[in-house]
Regions:
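Catalytic Tyr-X3-Lys loop
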Residues: 107, 119-153
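The beta1-alpha1 cofactor-binding region of Rossmann-like NAD(H)/NADP(H)-dependent oxidoreductases
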Residues: 54-55, 75-87, 137
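Conserved glycine-rich Rossmann-like NAD(P)H-binding loop of the short-chain dehydrogenase/reductase
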Residues: 33-58
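Rossmann-fold cofactor-recognition segment
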Residues: 62-80
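A glycine-rich helix->loop->beta "capping" turn
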Residues: 67-72, 90-103, 109, 134-139
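A short helix-coil junction within the Rossmann-fold of NAD(P)-dependent oxidoreductases
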Residues: 31, 94-95, 108-112, 157-166
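Canonical Rossmann dinucleotide-binding motif of NAD(H)/NADP(H)-dependent dehydrogenases/reductases
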Residues: 3-42
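Amphipathic alpha-helical dimer-interface segment in Rossmann-like NAD(P)H-dependent oxidoreductases
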Residues: 89, 145-164
Length: 166
C-alpha cells in the first residue's frame, strides 16, 4: 500500500475513529494521503471481539502516522451545520486543502419489533413500540440527522474548497 498515489492529497473521513472509517483512514494513509479524522467522540473506544483489542481515534491516528501521513483529529458533532463548517475550515487551515471527502459518519437504528431488549439505563436507538406509527419523532430525526444530514453538511462544507482548488 505504499505506492504514494495520493501524495500531497488530504482526505477527510467522518466517523473515522472506528470500523469502516478506520479502514478508509489506514488505506488512504497507505497510499500517501494526509488524513483528517472527524468523529463525534475521538476518545470513545470500540472493542472488536474478534481481535480482543481496544481501538480509538488515537490508535488510528498513530497507525496512519506510522504509514507516513500527517494526521489531524477533530472532535465535532456533524449533525450541526455550523460545527461541520468550522471543522472543515480547521482542516483546511491546518492541512492546506481537502481533496477527498468520505462521509462515513452514521449510526442509530429504528427497528420495529414487539420485543427488544432495552438496557437498564433505557438509552437505545431502537423503537420498542413495535409499529412505525408509534415511533417517536425525536428518534427518527436523530437517525436522519446522523445518517443523512451529516453527509449533506459535510459535502456542502467541502464543496467551496474543492471548487477553488480545481
Amino acid at each position: 500500500m505504499s505506492e504514494n498515489k495520493l501524495a500531497g492529497k488530504v482526505a477527510l473521513i467522518t466517523g473515522g475513529a472506528r470500523g469502516l472509517g478506520r479502514g478508509y483512514a489506514l488505506h488512504l494513509a497507505g497510499l500517501g494521503a494526509d488524513v483528517a479524522i472527524v468523529d463525534r467522540n475521538l476518545r470513545a473506544a470500540e472493542v472488536y471481539e474478534f481481535e480482543k483489542e481496544l481501538l480509538k481515534a488515537d490508535t488510528v491516528m498513530e497507525e496512519c502516522e506510522a504509514l507516513g501521513a500527517h494526521v489531524l483529529g477533530i472532535e465535532a458533532d456533524l449533525t450541526d451545520r455550523e460545527v461541520t463548517e468550522a471543522a472543515v475550515a480547521r482542516l483546511v487551515d491546518e492541512l492546506g486543502s481537502v481533496d477527498i471527502a468520505i462521509c462515513n459518519a452514521g449510526g442509530g437504528t429504528v427497528v420495529f419489533a414487539d420485543e427488544v431488549e432495552v438496557p437498564e439505563d433505557g438509552q437505545t436507538d431502537i423503537n420498542t413500540t413495535g409499529t412505525a406509527s408509534d415511533c417517536p419523532q425525536e428518534m427518527l430525526t436523530r437517525v436522519l440527522d446522523t445518517n443523512l444530514m451529516t453527509c449533506m453538511y459535510t459535502c456542502m462544507a467541502v464543496a467551496p474548497y474543492m471548487k477553488a482548488q480545481k
